[in-house]
């Protein structure tokens, strides 16, 4: 029996290539001898990572270990998340980001994109949206020295290059100070909820209205606002019980995603794409908008 238990993880080894783990929302290491192996990677390290990622019952073992620590010690031992104060959950905190060459190169790329757009009479706007820790830094666990000074340095570089940009951080901090929950305490630990998105997107629309007066901010009455019960953390099987605000548009949208899906070249790991038409806004003369977004 012991031998059977010992060999079962090997018997259920995960051989599938290019698979994303549901427990920690990342792509598992591919076979270092296969066609999808990372070029130039250290073979020993790749083999070790491959076995650790693909061993049978990996997700179940991680979940069991996480739940045991939560119930016994109220500690979240999880690849993605950690507890803060007062019941808050955050993405696992890493070392503070240091402003460097990458950010300078990224700012210069944005300036080039803006120049490309403006040469074709197309307005350009870069939007920076804050992570949860930037709006609720006081809810991080003790011992965390949260420093996002790189953001100010990055925005200073954007100003030097003349990039048209807005930052929604202060807006959401002000909304929080006014008593509104613009990020959930637990669910979706890094991203704003629909209420936060409502305010952030309106700030974007107000900025764009300077180019196109026909663009108007949304109103709460434009949406059916309900609550959705979330029973696990996002991209995880960790159990929770939290309601989040859900905004559904009352105006029916035309969805053309499938019609154009094959025409849009995308990275294999980032396949997100959507094409939506709001007939009411089209009738009001609103322009088409192309949005590139990160997390």
Language-model features: locations:
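Extracellular glycan-modifying ectodomains
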Residues: 1-295
């Amino acid at each position: 029996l012991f031998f059977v238990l010992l060999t079962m993880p090997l018997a259920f080894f995960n051989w599938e290539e290019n698979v994303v783990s549901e427990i920690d929302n990342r792509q598992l290491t591919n076979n270092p001898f296969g066609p999808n192996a990372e070029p130039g990677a250290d073979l020993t390290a790749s083999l070790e990572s491959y076995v650790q990622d693909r061993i049978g019952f990996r997700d179940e073992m991680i979940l069991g270990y996480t739940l045991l620590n939560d119930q016994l010690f109220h500690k979240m031992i999880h690849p993605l998340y950690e507890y803060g104060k007062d019941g808050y959950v955050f993405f696992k905190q890493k070392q503070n980001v240091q402003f460097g060459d990458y950010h300078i190169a990224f700012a210069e790329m944005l300036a080039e994109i803006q120049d490309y757009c403006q040469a074709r009479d197309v307005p350009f706007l870069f939007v920076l949206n804050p992570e949860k820790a930037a709006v609720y830094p006081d809810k991080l666990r003790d011992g965390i020295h949260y420093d996002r000074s790189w953001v100010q340095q990055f925005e200073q570089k954007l100003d030097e290059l003349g990039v048209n940009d807005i930052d929604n951080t202060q807006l959401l901090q002000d909304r929080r100070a006014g008593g509104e929950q613009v990020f959930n305490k637990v669910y979706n630990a890094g991203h704003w909820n629909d209420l936060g998105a409502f305010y952030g997107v309106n700030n974007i629309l107000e900025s764009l209205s300077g180019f196109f007066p026909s663009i108007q901010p949304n109103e709460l009455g434009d949406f059916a606002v309900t609550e959705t019960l979330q029973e696990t953390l996002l991209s995880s099987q960790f159990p929770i019980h939290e309601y989040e605000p859900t905004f559904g548009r009352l105006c029916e949208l035309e969805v053309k995603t499938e019609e154009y899906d094959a025409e849009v070249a995308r990275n294999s790991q980032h396949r997100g794409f959507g094409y939506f038409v709001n007939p009411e806004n089209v009738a009001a003369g609103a322009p088409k908008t192309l949005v590139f977004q990160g997390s």
